[in-house]
Amino acid sequence: MQVTSVGHAGFLIESRAGSILCDPWVNPAYFASWFPFPDNSQLDWDALGDVDYLYVSHLHKDHFDPEHLRRYVNKDAVVLLPDYPVPDLRRELEKLGFHNFFETTDSVKHTVSGPKGDLDVMIIALRAPADGPIGDSGLVVSDRVTTVFNMNDARPVDLDVLHTDFGQIDVHMLQYSGAIWYPMVYDMPARAKEAFGIQKRQRQMDRCRQYIAQVGATWVVPSAGPPCFLDPELRDLNDDHGDPANIFPDQMVFLEQLRIHGHDGGLLMIPGSTADFTGSTLNSLTHPVDDPESIFTTGKAAYIEDYAQRMAPVLAAEKARWAPSAGEPMLEALRALFEPIMTQTDQICDGIGYPVELRLTGRDHNETVVLDFPKRVVREPIPDEKFRYGFEIPAALVRTVLRDEEPDWVNTIFLSTRFRAWRVGGYNEYLYTFFKCLTDERIAYADGWFAEAHDDSSSITLDGFQIQRRCPHLKADLSKFGVVEGNTLTCNLHGWQWNLENGRCLTTKGHELRCQKL
């Protein structure tokens, strides 16, 4: 089996039984904030797109690139479709002309048969509101000699099914770097922001190592990030200037962490790198350049500068597509968008629990709108009103998502990092869930998900405490992801924390943990 990196989370998996193209992403994403790193635009995409199977893990724009899929990928390819409760992914692929779908069942091993032979596949589908745009997934592929697990940026809760159905995993591709706007966009003291950044940088790599230990693959390929920020307004987000609080470490940083912790099976792959495997044996690893490591080390800043110069026309063209900042007040348009969604979800509106301020700003427009979740209305602010949570977003971006009828502001505005935020207290998961569920179908699913009781009947003992086995957040197994420091429990799946003296969640309201000291 051959595995070729096509950039970011993208891979071409080739075997005698067929070829699978996974998550090809080339065009800038999230209001042109994110570019693939290293540059993959010069690959032979006509050849790469001539495949038997296509796998798109989820709808985040650094995985689902509609323009690229429309232009380059064989429309007769069989799409390996994750088992999602809301069929948005299938609908979007159908719009692009794909018509052959193999609908998988979550975490069930399937055999796909084509003219070249049989492949065993499994797609682990994650369905919580926090997982992607209502869905994220990982793909297992076996040609019955070699088995690869392309986890990309999914965060599976239970991986025992891998070994039950496939035995030894030979190659494991997964995310290790940042893919979020925290803490950079938040108004907070510089020392606090630095401390949170240092903590997040390490935690996300620790989580990745925990997954690697659970899967136990012979070879590990760090993937699915980091992105590259080429807009001069965002260039400081690149990890090329020795900032220990930067949340976007690159492959070389993580491979060194693996070595420090005794794992020598890490592989550096850049766009165009090809690894050939027979079972757990690595037969060869070839790269498109003589010294790929220099892209991430001595030559990184120069590489990014050259990349930015090449992509300046692309960036300018993307910005030209944005709606103008100036225009009519947006209160009525936002009311028409948000209020019908608010009225459909007591779970999420009550979970948010307070009004949220939206400042819409630009050279030609300044407006403040209040999302009053307790009252389920969108209104103007009351004089001298104070807010626990607020955002300042360029008016041009809000006009653009309104014009384009975007169903998900996380997948457009928030991942762009082109905004500011402030809050009193902890992270509010319900708020960001609301912003990613701006359709009747999505909000109905998310409301129902939160309404379901979480199973906390099983218990474990961890460092002198008896606690419920499943994390109150997304049901991760705390015997694998839980870490106790003093009287604080951290679930390393998403970094949420609890006070073990009283079970109170320290990250957000609700989500209490059943626990007692032994």
From Swiss-Prot:
Cofactor(s) named in the record: [2Fe-2S] cluster
Per the record, its GO cellular-component terms are: cytoplasm
Give the PROSITE patterns listed for this entry.
RIESKE
Pfam families in UniProt: Lactamase_B_3, Rieske, SCP2_Rv3818
Enzyme Commission code: 1.-.-.-
What top-level branch of life does the organism fall under? Bacteria
Query: Which residues does the annotation say bind [2Fe-2S] cluster?
Result: 471, 473, 491, 494
- Record flagged with keyword tRNA-binding: no
Q: Check the record and name the InterPro entries matching this protein.
A: RibonucZ/Hydroxyglut_hydro, Rieske_2Fe-2S, Rieske_2Fe-2S_sf
| Coiled coil (residue ranges) | none
Keywords annotated in UniProt = 2Fe-2S, Iron, Iron-sulfur, Isopeptide bond, Metal-binding, Oxidoreductase, Ubl conjugation
Protein's recorded name: Putative Rieske 2Fe-2S iron-sulfur protein MSMEG_6410/MSMEI_6242
- According to its UniProt entry, this protein's organism is Mycolicibacterium smegmatis (strain ATCC 700084 / mc(2)155)
